[in-house]
Each structure stands twice: as structure tokens, then as C-alpha cells.
Amino acid sequence: MKLYFVRHGRTEWNEEGRIQGANGDSPLLESSIQQLEALGRHLSQTYFDAAYSSDLPRAVHTAQIILEQNQHPISLQETPALQEWRLGRLEGRKIVELKALYPEEMKAFRHNLAEFHHDIFGAESVEETTQRTENFIKSLKDQSGEAILIVGHGANLTASIRTLLGYKPEELRKNGGLTNASVTILTTDDFEHFNLLQWNDTSYLED
């Protein structure tokens, strides 16, 4: 089975440098909608046996744009299990301001999640955010077919995908985070062991 993970398109809050989390949301930028249409065309011949997205509007809209371009129509299923990392009091605030107020915590969130003290902000722990998404992914083991589309969010997907690949918390951000509208592909035979086929790819924009 191939799992196609897509981070949602760039939003107004992304442009403003604000943390969205699970309780904040903002519309996709027009430029990002065009990118997602290009991604949809890039994946248009891929036969998805199922398609899932976070139930947050920016992810749902992203998934809908991709599926509208596909040659094999399929319904989208939404789930809170794929929501962005629930970041409590960090949500809605500008990253530049948070770096000034909490330099060590923001550094940890970006580079070493083992040192991120989530409780300061009333946020999910790294274990909580990855476990809910990992549990959902593993629940798909009885899904028949060869390909599944999964649309979610940057912080949660970066940590969750690398957790599926066996990385420790301090290693989850080692290669940085996922880019908006990027595609990451994992393969699995048993939904217990996963292999990385493609990471954070946006090469379709060069076509």
C-alpha cells in the first residue's frame, strides 16, 4: 500500500506567520489554490482507493481541490484524528512574537520536540499528537487497494510520519518540517512497518 500524505495549501495565517493549530483556521491563498490544482493534475492518474483529510477547513479544501482533478472520482472522508497539533495558547499568535517571548520553547518546537514543554501552553504533547494520528493510520490496515490519500497539517504530519518511520522525539524535526502543498509517500505491507518513498516533494511545480 502507498500512503500519499499532503500538507494543506498555504493560508492567510501562514502568510502572516501565525500559528494555526487545531482551533485556528484561515482560507487558502489564491496562489496556493493554483498550486493545489497543479498537484491535482500531477496526481490525476493515481487511483486512490480512499481519501481522508483533517476536518479543519484548510485541509478539507485542499483535499477537495486535489480530488476534483482526479480521473477516478472518490468521496472524501474527514476525521479529527488528522487535525493539526493542538497548541493551546500558541494558536493565533505570530511566530516572531512567540520567539521573543519563549525563545527556548520555540527553538525546541522547531528543532527538538523532546525538549518542548507543551504543558506551559496547554498544548498536546508530542506523544499525544503523534499517537492519535498513528492510531488512525494503523486502523486503515483492512483497507483494500493500493493507494490512500491523506491530507493534514505541517507540525502534526511531520512528527507523525517520522514516528511511523521509527524516529525518536528528538529526531522528528531533524530534516525540518513539511512544506505547504508537498507530497510525502510511505509504503507498507502490514501497517506496522513503513518505508519512506518520497519526502516533502513539490517538484510538480516545475512541470
Each predicted region: which residue ranges?
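Short glycine/proline- and acidic residue-enriched helix-loop micro-motifs
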Residues: 107-128
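Phosphate-coordination/substrate-recognition cap region in phosphate-metabolizing enzymes
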Residues: 38-107
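Acidic, low-complexity terminal tails and accessory targeting/binding regions
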Residues: 68, 72, 87-100, 146, ...
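GST superfamily/GST-like fold recognition
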Residues: 154-158, 195
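Loop-to-helix element that buttresses phosphate recognition and phosphoryl-transfer chemistry
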Residues: 10-65, 121-134
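Extreme N-terminal starter segment of soluble prokaryotic enzymes
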Residues: 1-4
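Active-site metal-binding loops of divalent metal-dependent hydrolases
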Residues: 9, 154, 202
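Glycine-rich phosphate-binding loop signature in dinucleotide/nucleotide-binding domains
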Residues: 45-47, 140-147
